């Protein structure tokens, strides 16, 4: 419950102390801030509990977790802070520099199971993950700049249906 309350009452998406504002929308564009959502809280908590049943959550450096669970039966999905050169400014309490991204890639390349890695299109990942399957989507950042988001996979999705389960259209 505390987690859900923190999500709903958070000050924007950043966690580095930068002022981004209280969640609200006086123009009615975002139903996400409606009081009705609070009435649905018990149901949402039950849905979340069902969804994460059997999921193991670790609070350790990602590289350590990936190395510990290096097995063909373990799927790794990584959504790290995007490479600094692809975005405007620091946005996370725990940032990653290029050296950290290199270390992460080294560990992912050694992983025996399936890997999915999210990020903006960048030379570092493209160079190191040559041969991995890529799926691209074009989005616009908060500054309205065009960004290509990429999902790198160390496997080929079996078919279009499997791919749509990973990336809904």
PLM segments and residue spans:
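Class I S-adenosyl-L-methionine
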Residues: 56, 60-75, 82-169
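SAM-dependent nucleic-acid methyltransferase catalytic core
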Residues: 1-77, 81-89, 122, 163
């Amino acid at each position: 419950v505390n987690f859900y309350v923190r999500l709903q009452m958070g000050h924007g998406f950043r966690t580095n102390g930068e002022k981004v504002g209280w969640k609200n929308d006086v123009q009615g564009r975002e139903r996400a801030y409606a009081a009705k959502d609070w009435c649905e809280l018990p149901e949402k908590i039950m849905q979340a509990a069902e969804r994460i049943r059997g999921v193991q959550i670790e609070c350790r450096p990602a590289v350590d977790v990936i190395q510990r669970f290096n097995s063909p039966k373990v799927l790794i999905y990584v959504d790290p802070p995007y490479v600094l050169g692809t975005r405007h400014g620091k946005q996370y309490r725990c940032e990653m520099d290029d050296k950290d991204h290199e270390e992460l890639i080294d560990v992912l390349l050694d992983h025996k199971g399936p890997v999915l890695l999210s990020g903006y299109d960048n030379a570092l990942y493209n160079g190191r993950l040559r041969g991995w399957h890529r799926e691209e989507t074009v989005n616009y950042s908060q500054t309205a700049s065009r960004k290509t988001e990429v999902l790198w996979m160390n496997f080929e999705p079996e078919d279009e249906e499997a791919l749509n389960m990973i990336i809904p259209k």
